[in-house]
Curated annotation (Swiss-Prot):
Induction: Expressed in the intermediate phase of the viral replicative cycle.
Family: Belongs to the glutaredoxin family.
Gene transcribed to yield this protein: OPG075
Disulfide feature: 23-26
Protein name, entry field: Glutaredoxin-1
Organism annotation: Monkeypox virus
Occurrences of domain Glutaredoxin (ranges): 3-106
Listed InterPro entries: GLR_AS, GLRX1, Glutaredoxin, Glutaredoxin_euk/vir, Glutaredoxin_subgr, Thioredoxin-like_sf
């Protein structure tokens, strides 16, 4: 069930972030991503509260990404990790280029 929940959200080539809105690391990751202007439908925020039991979802995250914590961030079906991974990419000034290369940003 967790696999289906996650894979349905990763079906399109987009940026998907699984969060808990009470988590400060999730809010920080959203702040980084919200600096960019995404094409319609190219960015999805998924509150993990939508899935019960949450532990099953976290177990699946661990199976496919190596981590149970949120945020879990995907570019297409590829996990880039969590907040610290996103922050590292952003601090290298590479995030915008990556997002452009996968075609999720507005270019005008």
């Amino acid at each position: 069930m967790a696999e289906e929940f996650v894979q349905q959200r990763l079906a399109n080539n987009k940026v998907t972030i699984f969060v808990k809105f009470t988590c400060p690391f999730c809010r920080n990751a959203l702040d980084i991503l919200n600096k960019f202007s995404f094409k319609r439908g190219a960015y999805e925020i998924v509150d993990i509260k939508e899935f019960k039991p949450e532990n099953e979802l976290r177990d699946y995250f661990e199976q496919i990404t190596g981590g149970r914590t949120v945020p879990r961030i995907f570019f297409g079906k590829t996990s880039i990790g969590g907040y610290s991974d996103l922050l590292e990419i952003d601090n290298m000034d590479a995030l915008g280029d990556i997002l452009l290369s996968i075609g999720v940003l507005r270019t005008c």
